Amino acid sequence: MKNILKILVVAIISLLVVGCKEEYSLNYILHQTDNLSIYEIEGKKYVETTEATNYVKLDVDKYGILIAELYPEIAPITVKNFKELISKNFYNNFIFHRVIKDFMIQTGDPNGDGTGGSSEEIKGEFSANGVINDLSHVRGTLSMARRGAVPETEETLNSASSQFFIVHADSTYLDGNYAAFGSVIHGMDVVDIIANVSTDSYDKPVIDQILNNITFVKEYTGGEI
């Protein structure tokens, strides 16, 4: 009888272990259940979804994840374009091709050198282009990269497509000239790591810093895992 009880206890424990596995990365815990992958970061839990929500997960190779919130009420054209690219799995296996400590880290170029983008350019949503945008370029802000010129032209003001940057340290002098559209709400430690890597004379990291993908997420509202 005792042996039977021992076997039952072991079987129950095994089921519990199989039912919910935990993996630890640099800045998050991955809870694996039978049908869900739950990402816990800074006390919040998120699950991936095919729904185009206003929350996205940036999976950075070796370092962990960032969770960012998008603001369609501030930059509707920019957010719509960003969501469409995510839905097409556009942002898979890109590098952060431009990194400047205390300024920003930039990605989203399929060429990996700052010359490329997606097939469609969008209207620049910022005051220099006649659009109100009150999201400031403070630490953690997501904003669209674009071509520049002196003087600016209609072409350069509306040249953003897929490249974007994450502000490392407050850079409010960019306000009014670039389309800010979101903010990192969890995972700025990953931005700090990338911002401090060695770069060459073109501000490109000596060792590739890889963005594995960007996916939509939503807050996990289930019970205890």
Task: Give residue spans per PLM region.
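Hydrophobic h-region of N-terminal signal peptides that target proteins for export
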Residues: 11-19
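Cyclophilin-like peptidyl-prolyl cis-trans isomerases
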Residues: 19-225
